[in-house]
Amino acid sequence: MIKVKNAKFITSASRITQAPPPILSEVVFMGRSNVGKSTLINTILDSNLAKSSSTPGKTRLINFFETCWEDMQTNQNLTFNIIDLPGIGYAKVSKAEMEQWKKSLWEFITKRSNIKLFIHLIDSRHLGLEIDENLYNVLESFLRNDQNILRVFTKADKLKKNELAKLYQKNGVIMGNK
């Protein structure tokens, strides 16, 4: 088991040239707007470092957090960055701003050399959406051998028991923070 020792906000960037140098391995949280990326990051880090809101499009920049974890069995530390990306899809922004986001995000996820894991968050109440399938397919299209994709289904607490059972049967793992 690993446990977070500490986490801190590093910086926000609107494009890859503003990002901190890729020194540590990186884990990217991505998905549709308002799927719970920032909330999940805060839950995992047991903090309120990532700004979250019920308003879609709250995260408008690429946010970097440095984290240090302790392996409880070996007492060894592991340090890596967590990256909170703006949501894909709906947000209360202009069309021009949305296009700039898409361009910046594409450049970031395809060119950032230290990304090792893409955590693709999917709202468990809205499975099979084209936007989620497209995102997964895009990630697979450029995935390197040293990278992985992990699908995480959020908002499972809003499902009925039979819907939760179907989600579990199809995907195998269900976790909660309550």
Range-by-range predicted roles:
Residues 1-92:
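Conserved G1/Walker A P-loop phosphate-binding module
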Residues 23-24, 42-44, 95-98, 133-137, ...:
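Short, glycine/charged-enriched secondary-structure capping and boundary segments
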Residues 53, 93, 120-124:
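Conserved short-loop catalytic and cofactor-binding motifs
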Residues 65, 176-178:
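Short, highly charged low-complexity linear segments
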Residues 69, 96-101:
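Generic secondary-structure boundary signal with a strong preference for alpha-helix termini
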Residues 77, 102-176:
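Conserved C-terminal guanine-recognition region of P-loop GTPase G domains, centered on the G4
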Residues 88-98, 157:
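Flexible beta-alpha connector loops of hexameric P-loop NTPases
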